[in-house]
Regions:
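Short, well-structured N-terminal submotif of metal-dependent ribonuclease cores
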Residues: 1-42, 56-62, 124, 136-141
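A residue-level structural signature of the nucleotidyltransferase/glycosyltransferase Rossmann-like core
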Residues: 5, 40, 77, 114, ...
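Alpha-helix/helix-capping structural signal
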Residues: 11-12, 46, 120, 133
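Active-site-proximal, substrate-binding regions of enzyme catalytic domains
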Residues: 28, 38, 48-76, 81-83
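Short secondary-structure transition/capping segments
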Residues: 54, 91-92, 109-110, 125-129
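Short acidic, glycine/proline-enriched helix-loop-strand junctions
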Residues: 64-85, 122-141
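Active-site neighborhoods of divalent-metal-dependent phosphate/nucleic-acid chemistry enzymes
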Residues: 76-119
């Protein structure tokens, strides 16, 4: 599979940075695929503040900045247009508005997949949600 575009959910980034078991190795592989150019990876703009906030209990400010720089070497940042955010507001069938925004950000870059460990939260997603492990299996086919 060539030219695959993915949006990586904040939970995958957090699994990677915090070496959270049992997800760390799968998260590492996703970040590595993005960094090496096997896939083109994106991170939703609003995920950066989520990552920053959660990491405050794991590490000091300087370390968080260093980790964000590393992540941003592997992933491009994307947002959603005004129109896509308005569309998200109207998508009341999404249980979690933040996940709906992830879906809109993925749509904005024509992503084929949202890489997440919370696939169940994306059952209404326009973009296919897949776990890091399942994505790696898919790529190997």
């Amino acid at each position: 599979m060539k030219n695959i575009v993915v949006l990586v959910d904040a939970n995958v980034i957090l699994d990677y940075v915090t070496t959270r078991d049992p997800y760390y190795h799968d998260a590492y592989k996703i970040i590595d695929m993005c960094h090496s150019g096997i896939v083109k990876g994106y991170l939703a703009f609003h995920s950066i503040s989520i990552i920053w906030y959660v990491l405050r209990k794991y590490m000091p400010d300087a370390d968080r900045r260093s980790w964000l720089k590393k992540i941003l070497q592997a992933l491009h940042v994307t947002g959603a247009s005004h129109e896509l955010v308005l569309k998200a507001v109207d998508m009341d069938y999404f249980m979690d508005f933040e996940d709906c925004l992830q879906d809109r950000c993925a749509e904005s870059v024509n992503a084929q997949y949202i890489i997440t460990n919370n696939v169940k939260d994306f059952k209404e997603s326009v973009i296919t949600a897949i776990t890091p492990r399942d994505f790696e299996r898919l790529i190997k086919q």
